[in-house]
Amino acid sequence: MSDKRRTFAVIDGNSLMHRAFHAVPPTMNAPDGRPTNAIFGFLNMFLKMIDAFNPDGVVVAFDKGKPRVRMEMLPQYKAQRPPMDPDLHAQFPMIKELLTALNVPILQSEGWEGDDILGTLARLGEEAGCDMLLVTGDRDMYQLVTEHVNVVSTRKGLSDVAIMTPESVDDLYHGIKPALVPDFYGLKGDTSDNIPGVPGIGPKKASALIAQYGSLDEVIAHADEVKGKMGENLRAHIDDALLSRKVATIRTDAPVELDFDETSFPAFSADEVSAALGALGITAMQNRFLSLIGGEGGAAVTAGTFEIPPVMRAAAGDAEALAAAAAEISRAIDAGEWIA
C-alpha cells in the first residue's frame, strides 16, 4: 500500500457487531434499559482501527434482508443458522444511529450481504486510486486482497487481529493466491455458510490439490489422477465443487456507490456525537471521539496497536482477588477502556 494514495476503511458491520456481542459481557445497558454491549465493543474496535490506520474515510456495510443473491444459487445457504439473539438484533438500529451521528456512510442493499458491498467498494476504491482496508472476520474475504486492498481480519473476539496482504494469504493457504480462495472453498466447502464443497476434502487437502494443479478447473480436469476415496468423492461431486466456488465468490457488482472524493473522516459534530453516546449511556467514550477532531478532554488511544491490557483472572473462592477484579472492571468502564 502506498503513502501517497488516500486510504479508506470499509467495515463489515454485521461481522463486527456479532463478534462484539459475544466478546463483551451482556451487562451494559442504556439508561432506558436497552442492551449496549455490542455497541460498546464495536466502538472500541472502531476507535482502535482509526488510531492504528488513520484512514482518510470510513464506511460501514450491513446485510439487508435475506441473502437473496446466494439463496438463488444455493437455497440452503446459511439455512442452518439459528435466529439472531434478540439483544443483538436490538442494537443494530442503535449502532446505525451512532454511525449517522459520526457522519460515517452506511451502505446496504436489499438481498445483498455486507461481504458483497465490501467487495464492490474494494474494486471501486482501487479503480479510484485508493488504498482499501476491509475490516471483517470472514476469511472468504481474503480473495479480494491485492497490492492496494488489505483485509484487517478480526479472528478471535476483537483483540486478535491480522493484516492480510497478498503474501500473508499465500502463506496461510500454502501457495494459493487470493484470486484462488473461491477455488479453495469450492473443494473444502464452508460449514458455517452451509456450502457443501466435496465430502472428505478439508483445508489441507484442498490447498494441496490447488497448489498441485493450479486451480479448481485443473483439479477437475485431472480428477482421474486423484487416488483413493478422495478421488472418488471428487469425481462424484464435481457439480457441488463448481457451485460451491460460485457461492463463495464475493460479488463486486452490488448496487451501491460512494463518492470517494467527498467522503472523509473525522467529519462529525461534537455535540451530535456526545448526545448520541449520552443517550446510550456510553459517556466514557466521548473524550476519545472528541480527540479525533481536536476536542478537549483526553488523548486518543496510542496509534498503531490493537493490543489490550493484560487479562486479570481471579479464582471463584478468592474474595480479595474478585473484589480487585471487579474494581478494575469498574475503573475500565468509567475510563472507556476495552473489556472482554
Predicted regions and their residues:
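Alpha-helical scaffold elements within enzyme catalytic domains, especially in hydrolases
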Residues: L98, L124, A276, R331-A332
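Noncatalytic, basic helical substrate-engagement surface that gates or grips nucleic-acid strands
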Residues: S2-V135, R139-T165, D240-L243, T249-E257
